[in-house]
Structures are given as C-alpha cells and as structure tokens.
C-alpha cells in the first residue's frame, strides 16, 4: 500500500451544472456459472464527482468497472448515462454511433497496464494525436501542438514526443496514457488500479498530478483500487465491496476514518490482502 501523508479533507467536489446524475447503476449483477462476481449494485454519480471502489482481490470491483464502462454486458440490471443533450440513455439501448461517441469523446479509460491503453510501437505524439483525429481533427500542426501541450501537462518533456512508449519508464507510460485519455476533454474517466505496479515515489508523483488534473478539468471519475491512500487522495465518495456486494458506502473521509463494517475496519487496518 502506498504510504503517503495526506490531508484528512477529501477533494472538494464542484457544484454540478445539472442536478441530474451523470451515470446511474441499477441492480447490476454478473455471474460466471455459480460464481456471483457482482451482485445487486446500485448508485448514482454526479458531474465533477470522483467515486472510489475499493476491496481486496476478487471482491468484484473490476467486474463492476467493466460493466459500468460498457466492456462487459451485465447479467442483471442496467447502466444509464446522461448524454450532452441532457437526455439519460440506457447503455444497452444505445446504437453503435452513440456508443462510439462515448468511447471516443465523452469517456476515457486508464488501465493498470499502460500497454493496454497505448500503442507501444508508435510515437507518444501519435498516441495522443490519434484520439484527436478520431473526433474529427485533421490539421497536423494543431494536433501536434495539442499533443505537445498535453505531454508537458503530464510532466513529459516535449523533446520525447517522437519517442515510442516502449522507450518510456513505467511512470511515464502511465502519464502518457492519461494524456491520451484526457486530450478530448471527456466528462467521465474510468480508472482501473491506475498506480498499480509503480514504485512508491512514482505513485505519489502520479497521484498528485491526477488530483490536479481532475480538479482543473472538473472531471467525473470512477476509480477501482485496493489502495486506500489512492481513494483518500482522489475521491469524494467510496464504495467498499466484499464478495461481489457493496457493504459500505459514504463520503471518503467518513468511511475511512470511522468504518462501520468489520470488513471495512480490517481493510483500513491493512490486514486484508490486496
């Protein structure tokens, strides 16, 4: 677990421009044979809000994230999302064009392994630029300028723009993946163990950068992590999962400082395995 000193005050959530939820999960469930990986999960996420989903390995948090982000079809329940026109749509009822819009424009997904979210053999500039081209930009000079600006924003020197991610360190790859996701100014970003596998010093630097970007851009985010320091630094609310169920939820500081459930108390005490 990342050992960093943090303020006891959670990030300040911006007042949402719309009082309707951005994303709604209703009674989500998924089973594999007799194994219930996720059971009866419901919650609402508002604009500018960051939700952390925490729990040990096998608790169901990654399965839940895949369903929320449209990568896995729920066995039961539904996921709804408020589109830019203000209309809330069920993901399962969206056409291909609407889903493509979400994945290219409105959503980002930061993988634990940057190689899953990057093209490792092409340049860093191309990794960022191709997402811009996917949303209709076609002026090479402007695309390169935007890519350069975003590399610098995630603390990657502009003189590395033509280098492939395979030449980058692990921390640089993760920062590049974040730039690739945020360059189109999505409204919602999904993060799956974004600091996993990184050295402690690299994790702390990455978390500080992520917290700044989330605040500056007013992003909504859903972050899956087993590291409670990540949850405390980034999230406004936290959901604790055990055995596929949400067993405790609330404001991050309240849950982590005064957990009610015995499982959450063990998790906070770092007794449970990652």
Regions found by a protein language model. Name each.
Residues 54-56:
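The feature captures the beta-strand-to-loop junction immediately N-terminal to the Walker
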Residues 69:
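Helix-to-loop junction immediately C-terminal to a conserved catalytic motif
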Residues 249-250:
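ABC ATPase "signature
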Residues 164-168, 172:
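Conserved ABC ATPase signature
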Residues 142-159, 268-269:
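Conserved ABC ATPase "signature" region
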């Amino acid at each position: 677990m990342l050992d960093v000193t943090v303020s006891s005050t959670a990030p300040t959530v911006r007042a949402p421009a719309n009082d309707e939820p951005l994303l709604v999960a209703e009674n989500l469930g998924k089973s594999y044979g007799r194994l219930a990986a996720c059971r009866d999960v419901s919650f609402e996420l508002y604009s500018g809000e960051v939700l952390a989903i925490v729990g040990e390995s096998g608790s169901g948090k990654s399965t839940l994230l895949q369903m929320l982000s449209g990568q896995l079809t729920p066995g039961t329940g539904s996921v709804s999302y408020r589109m830019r026109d203000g209309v809330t749509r069920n993901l399962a009822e969206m056409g291909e064009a609407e889903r493509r819009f979400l994945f290219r424009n409105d959503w980002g997904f930061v993988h634990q392994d940057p190689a899953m979210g990057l093209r490792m053999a092409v340049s860093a500039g191309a990794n960022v630029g191709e997402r811009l081209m996917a949303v209709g930009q076609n002026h090479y000079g402007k695309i390169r300028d935007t890519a350069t600006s975003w590399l610098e924003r995630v603390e990657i020197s502009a003189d590395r723009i033509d280098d492939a991610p395979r030449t980058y360190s692990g921390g640089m790859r993760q920062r590049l993946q974040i730039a690739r996701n945020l360059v189109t100014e999505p409204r919602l970003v999904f993060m799956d163990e974004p600091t996993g596998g990184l050295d402690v010093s690299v994790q702390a630097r990455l978390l500080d950068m992520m917290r700044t970007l989330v605040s500056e851009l007013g992003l909504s985010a859903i972050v899956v992590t087993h590291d409670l320091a990540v949850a405390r630094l980034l999230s406004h609310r936290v959901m604790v999962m055990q055995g596929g169920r949400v067993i405790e939820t609330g404001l991050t500081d309240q849950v982590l400082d005064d957990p009610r459930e015995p499982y959450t108390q063990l998790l906070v005490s770092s007794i449970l395995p990652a």
